[in-house]
Design a protein with these regions (language model features):
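Surface-exposed extracellular loop regions of Gram-negative outer-membrane beta-barrel proteins
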Residues: 4-29
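Beta-sheet repeat architectures centered on beta-propellers
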Residues: 27-46, 52-249
Length: 249
């Protein structure tokens, strides 16, 4: 029953109130403006967006999202082409994603995602990656998420009937996500290679004092992979001190 209006520094709510004023405008937050015009998404009545000051959501009250990868994102983001930064919703897995260019790129080449289903105040779930999508539509329209990827170096030959003849200004690939096991791009099919890496673990649970002063011994790993297809390799990166170079198992 409301429309969100962002500036680059604040959030306003517009509501219909009837005659004589028709609409009311209420400022509900400051220092939480939108980093780019496409950097917000709404999920079940909650708005999520990316600001120059971090990640936020509005549930009837303004909330700053605790983000463990915030420095990783904001220390290496190119905010000059703000119009390229865009948000996407993957409601099949409860994820809100933001696609952005890093400091060495003028086009989108990075992604940061927040899982709003699995997150809690004590344990927010964030991931980062190199998935580059310039536009995203969730599964509500096509049944699966659909998105595009832009390649600024892409060109087409004048004899290529799959593209605009003689294009020299980059190419875009149109994807359907969350379907099949392989990537199909430009007529080529290849297996999707996936990986995930966590942050460091230390012993500091169950009220133990001296956080970071205990040595951890790992005897075995019991994975719980559901519907696994193919082989999976688990690598443990070990170090005794925070600034020490990691050694892999």
């Amino acid at each position: 029953d409301a429309i969100y209006i962002w500036t680059d520094t604040a959030l306003f709510i517009m509501r219909f109130v009837g005659a004589p004023f028709t609409f009311s405008f209420q400022q509900v937050g400051t220092n939480c403006g939108l980093i780019g015009q496409n950097a917000a998404v709404e999920v079940d009545g909650t708005a999520y967006w990316m600001s120059e000051n971090g990640f936020f959501r509005y549930t009837g009250k303004l909330e700053s999202l605790s983000c463990l990868v915030e420095d990783f994102v904001y220390d290496d983001i190119n905010t000059t082409p703000k119009q390229h930064i865009n948000a996407g919703l993957n409601n099949l897995f409860g994820e809100v994603m933001w696609f952005y260019p890093n400091s060495g790129s003028g086009v989108v080449n990075r992604m940061v995602a927040y899982n709003y289903l699995d997150s809690s105040v004590e344990r927010p779930v964030w991931t980062t990656g190199t998935l580059a999508r310039t536009a995203w539509q969730d599964s509500a329209v096509f049944g699966k998420p659909h998105a595009t990827e832009y390649n600024e170096d892409g060109t087409t030959a004048t004899t290529d009937t799959n593209y605009v003849f003689g294009n020299q200004d980059g190419t875009s690939t149109y994807y359907e996500h969350e379907t099949g096991l392989n990537q199909v791009k430009e007529g080529q099919t290849s297996a999707i290679t996936a990986s995930i890496e966590s942050g460091d673990f230390d012993i500091g649970q169950q009220g133990l004092a001296g956080d970071g002063e205990f040595m951890m011994k790992i005897r075995r790993v019991l994975p719980d992979f559901l519907s696994q297809t193919g082989d999976t390799r688990i690598t443990l990166n070990l170090r005794d001190f925070p600034n020490q170079t990691q050694a892999s198992s």
